[in-house]
Design a protein with these regions (language model features):
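N-terminal Rossmann-like dinucleotide-binding module
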Residues: 1-20
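Short, Asp-centered acidic motifs that coordinate Mg2+ and/or phosphate
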Residues: 3, 38, 118
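Beta-loop-alpha module in the N-terminal Rossmann-like domain of NAD(P)-dependent dehydrogenases
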Residues: 14, 19-81
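Acidic-histidine catalytic/liganding microenvironments
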Residues: 33-34, 85, 99, 197, ...
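A structural signal for well-ordered alpha-helical segments within the folded catalytic domains
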Residues: 49, 53, 76, 99-103, ...
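A contiguous active-site-proximal alpha/beta segment in oxidoreductase catalytic domains
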Residues: 69-148
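Rossmann-like dinucleotide-binding domain that binds NAD(P)(H)
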Residues: 141-220
Length: 220
């Protein structure tokens, strides 16, 4: 780790000292640093597009957390930038697509001649001991200004509005956040296995305000 950047001064200082890395209050200065080869973007979703675009334009390889952007407009800009720099590796953090279990599943599906009639995916969220034991204790900070928080919330709301339209409801926003925050992992996995869906057949509510979607895929 060569350099780090964070919106919290105390968090930035702590991480820089822990990993003996340079500290940048301005992330755009970090991506321009000559000793930085690749950039990991782990910021809130609403900053992914700007940081990734800046990194690509600075000639850096990019790993950006999911969702890569919150609206199509920003995604198209990133795709154009990535295509203009074929020498760079740019990827989104869909780690499930690289797990041994998933790769084995993909191999088995490809080698089986039987037609797939139905696929069902579940997301299990558990910050259990297996994961927590591999991480350091949380380092909490309380020095992020109200102005920065307000700007972040405003930016996020604006990008979701651009994606859904001005007349979108709070319920639609919540559903969209669930899709981009968690559901995108499942969608990325099933797309890797069977390709792009051709239509959304139905959407209906279940318990605890959750939503279930039926997608139709062109499975042979």
């Amino acid at each position: 780790i060569t350099a780090v950047s964070d919106v919290s001064p105390t968090q930035l200082k702590h991480i820089a000292e822990t990993y003996r890395a340079k500290a940048y209050a301005d992330p755009y200065m970090l991506v321009k640093a000559p000793d930085v080869d690749a950039v990991f973007i782990c910021s809130p979703d609403q900053y992914h597009a700007d940081y990734a675009l800046a990194a690509i334009e600075a000639g850096k390889h990019v790993f950006v957390e999911k969702p890569v952007t919150l609206c199509i407009e920003d995604l198209e800009k990133l795709i154009a930038a990535e295509k203009a720099h074929p020498e760079l590796v740019c990827m989104v953090g869909y780690m499930r697509r690289y797990s041994q279990g998933f790769l084995k599943c993909k191999e088995l599906l490809a080698s089986d001649d039987r037609k797939i009639e139905y696929m069902r995916f579940r997301d299990i969220i558990l910050e259990g001991d297996f994961f927590m034991d591999q991480t350091r204790p949380p380092y909490l900070c309380s020095d992020i200004s109200d102005e920065v928080k307000a700007e972040s919330s405003s930016r996020r709301r604006d990008q979701i509005t651009r994606a859904l339209g001005n007349d979108c409801t709070d319920q639609q926003r919540t559903t969209y956040v669930m899709l981009t925050g968690l559901g995108c992992h499942t969608l990325a996995a099933v797309r890797e296995l069977v390709g792009l869906p051709v239509e959304v057949e139905s959407v209906f509510p279940q318990v605890m305000q959750s939503r279930t979607c039926h997608y139709c895929f062109p499975i042979q």
